[in-house]
């Protein structure tokens, strides 16, 4: 009956445990080999959500025995012999090899893999457990003897191991939860820092884009300014050339004006001399005409002819002198008086005074003289001119006699 009970205590997952892969040591006893897990927590979560609470007892046996070494299982099988049942509690306390799960999980938590608890040697468990079954079968006879409660000892051992394992799993879970909380806090802190860094990066990117945009705008402004400066320089050069050309034209125009002013002054002087000579001749002609008229009125024609000859000889004095007739001047006392040095000096002074007059005055005099010449003559003047026209033929008739007398 004990052997039958022991065989009934074996689970169906123990028969196919030899084909377990090393990479995924934990499998679901209800689902089979196709559902395997790398960590104990993953298997436990699967059992909690997929199977009933009674199936968790399989998890304790499935995860306990792979962590036990061959020697530990041999010693546990030896504890079933008579005489050693009393010290089984001490042996288990001396060699709690299942506590290695906590150290393994703690080491893996340091390696940033808190969710993976890998069994030490899951394959060796199959061999050890089969050996233990054979030994248990061989020891059925002695254990079935009177006075040896083998079933109670096994049940108490399993309960003790289950309790220890549950406490260990709870401790591991608490440690893992603490570690998860710590890692969650660190992750939240790192996430916040990452968000801050990302916000700063986005802000710096925006600033960089703004700076690049301003740089492009300033580059465009600089290009436009350079083009404007080049255009203004070209315009300045053209303006300078135009100014130089205008200055040359102004200088040329000034020279032309100076030359024209000089010519105008010379022309005015010549015109003034011509007008003065003309006025003198007119005055002389008027005097001669008046004298002739007065002589004609008084009937002294001989005296008139003598005076006319003296006047003509005085007017022709330079020609006579140039021809070399000094005796003609010496024979006439009136001509000597006319060409006296004092008289010549007086005429020179008069000419100098007239030359020193302003151009406006000369122009005014010229205009007045032109007006006098161009104005219509009055009645007396018409008579005078008529008389003058009548006198000229007489004077022309008397000229040969006067010339003969001069010769």
UniProtKB/Swiss-Prot annotation:
Keywords: Coiled coil, Cytoplasm, Cytoskeleton, Metal-binding, Neurogenesis, Phosphoprotein, Zinc, Zinc-finger
Predominant cellular place of this UniProt entry's protein: cytoplasm
Zinc fingers typed C2H2-type, residue spans: 26-51
Subcellular location: Cytoplasm, Cytoskeleton, Microtubule organizing center, Centrosome
GO molecular function: zinc ion binding
Entry-annotated residues carrying Phosphothreonine: 175
Coiled coil regions in record: 169-296
A GO term from the CC aspect: cytoplasm
InterPro entries referenced in this protein's UniProt entry, alphabetically: FBX41/ZN365_Znf-C2H2, GenomicStab_NeuMorph_Reg
Taxonomic superkingdom: Eukaryota
Modified residues (Phosphoserine): 16, 138, 369
GO biological process, one term: telomere maintenance
Bias kind Basic and acidic residues: ranges: 362-381
Segments of this protein annotated with the region Disordered: 347-392
UniProt function note: Involved in the regulation of neurogenesis. Negatively regulates neurite outgrowth. Involved in the morphogenesis of basket cells in the somatosensory cortex during embryogenesis. Involved in the positive regulation of oligodendrocyte differentiation during postnatal growth. Involved in dendritic arborization, morphogenesis of spine density dendrite, and establishment of postsynaptic dendrite density in cortical pyramidal neurons. Involved in homologous recombination (HR) repair pathway. Required for proper resolution of DNA double-strand breaks (DSBs) by HR.
Subunit comment: Homodimers. Interacts with NDE1 and NDEL1. Interacts with DISC1. Interacts with PARP1. Interacts with MCRS1.
Protein name: Protein ZNF365
Organism: Pongo abelii
Gene responsible for this protein: ZNF365
């Amino acid at each position: 009956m004990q052997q039958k009970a022991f065989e009934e205590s074996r689970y169906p997952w123990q028969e196919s445990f030899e084909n377990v892969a090393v990479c995924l040591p934990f499998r679901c006893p209800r689902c089979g080999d196709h559902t395997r897990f790398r960590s104990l927590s993953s298997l436990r979560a699967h059992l909690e959500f997929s199977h009933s609470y009674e199936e968790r007892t399989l998890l304790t046996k499935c995860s306990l025995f792979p962590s036990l070494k061959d020697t530990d299982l041999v010693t546990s099988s030896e504890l079933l012999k008579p005489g050693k049942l009393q010290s089984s509690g001490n042996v288990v306390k001396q060699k709690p090899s299942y506590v290695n799960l906590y150290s393994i999980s703690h080491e893996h938590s340091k390696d940033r893999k808190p969710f993976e608890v890998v069994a030490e040697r899951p394959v060796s468990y199959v061999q050890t457990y089969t050996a233990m079954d054979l030994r248990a079968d061989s020891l059925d006879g002695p254990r079935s003897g009177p006075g040896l409660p083998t079933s109670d000892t096994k049940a108490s051992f399993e309960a003790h191991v289950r309790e220890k394992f549950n406490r260990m799993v709870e401790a591991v879970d608490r440690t893992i939860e603490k570690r998860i909380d710590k890692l969650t806090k660190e992750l939240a802190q790192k996430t916040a820092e990452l968000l801050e860094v990302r916000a700063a990066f986005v802000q710096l990117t925006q600033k960089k884009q703004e700076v690049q945009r301003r740089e492009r705008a300033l580059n465009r402004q600089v290009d436009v300014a350079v083009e404007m400066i080049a255009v203004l320089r070209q315009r300045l050069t053209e303006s300078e050339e135009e100014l130089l050309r205008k200055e040359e034209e102004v200088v040329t125009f000034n020279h032309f004006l100076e030359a024209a002013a000089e010519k105008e002054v010379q022309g005015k002087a010549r015109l003034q001399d011509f007008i003065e000579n003309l006025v003198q001749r007119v005055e002389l002609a008027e005097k001669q005409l008046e004298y002739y008229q007065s002589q004609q009125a008084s009937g002294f024609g001989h005296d008139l002819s003598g005076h006319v000859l003296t006047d003509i000889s005085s007017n022709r004095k330079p020609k006579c002198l140039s021809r070399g007739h000094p005796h003609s001047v010496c024979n006439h006392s009136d001509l000597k008086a006319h060409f006296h040095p004092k008289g010549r000096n007086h005429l020179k002074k008069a000419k100098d005074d007239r030359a020193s007059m302003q151009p406006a005055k000369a122009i005014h005099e010229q205009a007045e003289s032109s007006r006098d010449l161009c104005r219509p003559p009055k009645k007396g003047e018409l008579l005078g001119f008529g008389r003058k026209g009548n006198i000229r033929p007489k004077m022309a008739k008397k000229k040969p006699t006067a010339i003969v007398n001069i010769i």
